[in-house]
Amino acid sequence: MNETDIQKLLQEANDHVPRLSFEEANNIISTVDTLIIDVRETSEIEATGLIKNAINIPKSIIDTNFDHSLIKNHLSNNEDITILVYCAVGIRSALVGHKLLKDGYRKVLNLGGFSEWASNGGLIDSI
């Protein structure tokens, strides 16, 4: 896959999965039922922690033989839960968010990057 193909995939993902500002994400988390998914690799999370109450499902797992029960167990049959995805800066999360939409999840938003969340004082859990 060349750089042009990657840019097209990213543009398509960004067109379908809205990216939230810190304020928008914080408001949604405090007012709406959410499932927060960190798609960074485990080594990244070990170094920085993860957003409070987030679960980790690395993009590498989502891209290969993904078992949807990892998400469905957290949804508790509640289709109204909003799924927020994030990574380090928002690129992988856009791609994963788009995949989740294509897989049938209805409410998927890109929280963006952990670095923005942390620099704005967002709540973080260490592991």
Regions found by a protein language model. Give the residues of each.
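Rhodanese-like catalytic fold shared by cysteine-dependent sulfurtransferases
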Residues: 1-34, 42-82, 91-127
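Short, surface-exposed ligand- or partner-binding patches at beta-edge/loop junctions that are enriched
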Residues: 86
